[in-house]
């Protein structure tokens, strides 16, 4: 018989830096899950990623207090800010531009995000990422 799913927990945790402090501890503690077990498993799963990049994770909690988790790719906005060398997006993206990204940078981000995007091909994925860049106040070159 399959385990009964109690709930899903969505978090953003920095790669390789999961620890029992908030937001991880309280979120898992509410469901009675083993916090240290998750931290060790998550840190092992994200050790190949650049330390400190936020990684979205979806944790499935079961009735017998076990869990499974799926990691997603780093959010596009974080990758765009890193590529443009800025700390935050524009408060008024239509009038106030805060940085520039090239088509090549957008292609690299699209390749990294490809498993999580619903785009049909690389060009469509690049257009999606370019739209995110423009909505942050970045100028897309190329």
Curated annotation (Swiss-Prot):
Signal peptide bounds: none
Post-translational modification: One or more lysine residues are methylated.
Annotated Gene Ontology cellular component terms: cytosolic large ribosomal subunit
GO molecular function annotation: large ribosomal subunit rRNA binding; structural constituent of ribosome
Transmembrane keyword on record: no
Pfam family membership, one: Ribosomal_L11
GO biological process per UniProt: translation
Top-level taxonomic group: Bacteria
UniProt KW keywords: Methylation, Ribonucleoprotein, Ribosomal protein, RNA-binding, rRNA-binding
Protein purpose: Forms part of the ribosomal stalk which helps the ribosome interact with GTP-bound translation factors.
PANTHER family in UniProt: 60S RIBOSOMAL PROTEIN L12, LARGE RIBOSOMAL SUBUNIT PROTEIN UL11M
Assembly, per entry: Part of the ribosomal stalk of the 50S ribosomal subunit. Interacts with L10 and the large rRNA to form the base of the stalk. L10 forms an elongated spine to which L12 dimers bind in a sequential fashion forming a multimeric L10(L12)X complex.
NCBIfam families recorded: L11_bact (TIGR01632)
Protein family (similarity comment): Belongs to the universal ribosomal protein uL11 family.
Protein name: Large ribosomal subunit protein uL11
Source organism of this protein record: Stenotrophomonas maltophilia (strain K279a)
Upper lineage: Bacteria, Pseudomonadati, Pseudomonadota, Gammaproteobacteria, Lysobacterales
């Amino acid at each position: 018989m399959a385990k009964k799913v109690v709930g899903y927990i969505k978090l953003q945790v920095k790669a390789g830096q999961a620890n029992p402090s908030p937001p991880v501890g309280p979120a898992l503690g509410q469901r009675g899950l083993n916090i240290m077990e998750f931290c060790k498993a998550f840190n092992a799963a994200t050790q190949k990623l650049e330390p400190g990049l936020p990684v979205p994770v979806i944790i499935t909690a079961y009735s017998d207090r076990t869990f499974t988790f799926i990691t997603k790719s780093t959010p596009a906005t974080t990758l765009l800010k890193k590529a443009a060398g800025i700390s935050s997006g524009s408060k008024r993206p239509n009038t106030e531009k805060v940085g520039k990204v090239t088509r090549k940078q957008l292609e690299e981000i699209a390749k990294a995000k490809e498993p999580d995007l619903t785009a049909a091909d690389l060009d469509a994925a690049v257009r999606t990422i370019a739209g995110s860049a423009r909505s942050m106040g970045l100028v897309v070159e190329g």
